[in-house]
């Protein structure tokens, strides 16, 4: 009888070991190969897609558009008689704000194993792709100013000028791959990008409420 108890104990121990081993290979602990892209939790990061269903690529030109009815594309303008335009605005379906938008390019924070595509919740810099004078050549990268407005004048490499892209669950007729933008400065919590009217202009702005944001889609320029 003692020998039977010992045998039962050994069989039970082996079974528990196999169960524990099997659990280590569930979806809670995905295997990430050296060539895949992952975050700090070792999870594979999906690609961001444009309206044609193609991944966004670093250095390629895109129009960022709010797909909601009455809204429009993001563009650069000079609204303060400054030497360089620095206002990041949003077109609308009213005469004074009609337009096709200003193309942007995405620049990665640093070289990594992410390849040449933009992935969800990875740090990028957003830069308007526009012809500019030598004086304004460094005034095309997005940043957030002290009023929490999105403006240009940022710097690639500045940890406070980082943005990220997150997928939303919004279903908008005729649109696919709907996202939101977040401003993610170093050592601070990310904030959604929303919109506001300031001095008569539709501006992009950071918002504190997690549920308050404007959706965006990306269109190849």
UniProtKB/Swiss-Prot annotation:
InterPro entries: Kunitz_inhibitor_STI-like_sf, Prot_inh_Kunz-lg. Keywords: Disulfide bond, Protease inhibitor, Signal, Thiol protease inhibitor, Vacuole. Residues 1-26 form the signal peptide. GO terms for cellular component: vacuole. Its main location: other. CDD domains: beta-trefoil_STI_CPI-like. One of its GO terms (molecular function) is cysteine-type endopeptidase inhibitor activity. Residues 27-42 form a propeptide. Disulfide bonds join 84-136, 184-190. A motif (Vacuolar targeting signal) lies at residues 29-34. Transmembrane segments: none annotated. It is found in: Vacuole. Coiled coil: none annotated. Inhibitor of cysteine proteases. May protect the plant by inhibiting proteases of invading organisms. Belongs to the protease inhibitor I3 (leguminous Kunitz-type inhibitor) family. This is Cysteine protease inhibitor 8. It comes from Solanum tuberosum (Potato). The lineage of its organism: Eukaryota, Viridiplantae, Streptophyta, Embryophyta, Tracheophyta.
């Amino acid at each position: 009888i003692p020998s039977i108890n010992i045998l039962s104990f050994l069989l039970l121990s082996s079974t528990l070991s196999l169960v524990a081993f099997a659990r280590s290979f569930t979806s809670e602990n995905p295997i990430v190969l050296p060539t895949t892209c992952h975050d700090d939790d070792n999870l594979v990061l999906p690609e961001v897609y444009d309206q044609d269903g193609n991944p966004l690529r670093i250095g390629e030109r895109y129009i960022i558009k709010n797909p909601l009815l009455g809204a429009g594309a993001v563009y650069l303008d000079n609204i303060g008689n400054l030497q360089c335009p620095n206002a990041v605005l949003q077109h609308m379906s009213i005469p004074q704000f009609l337009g096709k938008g200003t193309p942007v390019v995405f620049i990665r924070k640093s070289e990594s194993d992410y390849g040449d595509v933009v992935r969800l919740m990875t740090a990028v810099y957003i830069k308007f792709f526009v012809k500019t004078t030598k004086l304004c050549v460094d005034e095309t990268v997005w940043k957030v100013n002290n009023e929490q407005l999105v403006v240009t004048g940022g710097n690639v490499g500045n940890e406070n000028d980082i943005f990220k892209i997150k997928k939303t669950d919004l279903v908008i007729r005729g649109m696919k791959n709907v996202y939101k933008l977040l401003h993610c400065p170093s050592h601070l919590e990310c904030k959604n990008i929303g919109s506001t009217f300031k001095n008569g202009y539709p501006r992009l702005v950071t918002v504190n409420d997690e549920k308050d944001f404007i959706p965006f889609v990306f269109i190849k320029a």
